[in-house]
Amino acid sequence: MDSSGYNSRMANRRSPTTAADPALLGRVKGLVRQVLGGTPADVYLFGSWARGTQRPTSDIDIAIESAAPLPRALLASLREALEESTIPNRVDVVDLAETDAAFRDRVRREGILWIASGSA
């Protein structure tokens, strides 16, 4: 390492943050549970937060899967609650019923089942 710390700083810039903040994710999960209430749906955490490669400014990606598309009012309420919360990261919400099969398969394969149907 050089005396200026340059090499260390550059390594930190390239390296993803690997430890997900459990308190932050817990707040997101709690808000999702609250808004979904008894809606029968599976909720997946996917993307960089699920892989553990997120950075401090990375958005949090969640996907909701139910037998039928979720009511637009419910999705709007969830998005609004997340935007108005004190959660510092943007949270992207995807209704899997509105996506193509390849995307759904990727979320199911690579994502983490965060909330199981009926436990919201």
Regions found by a protein language model. Give the residues of each.
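Catalytic core of pol beta-like nucleotidyltransferases
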Residues: 1-44, 51-56, 65-120
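Short, well-ordered beta-strand segments
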Residues: 61-63
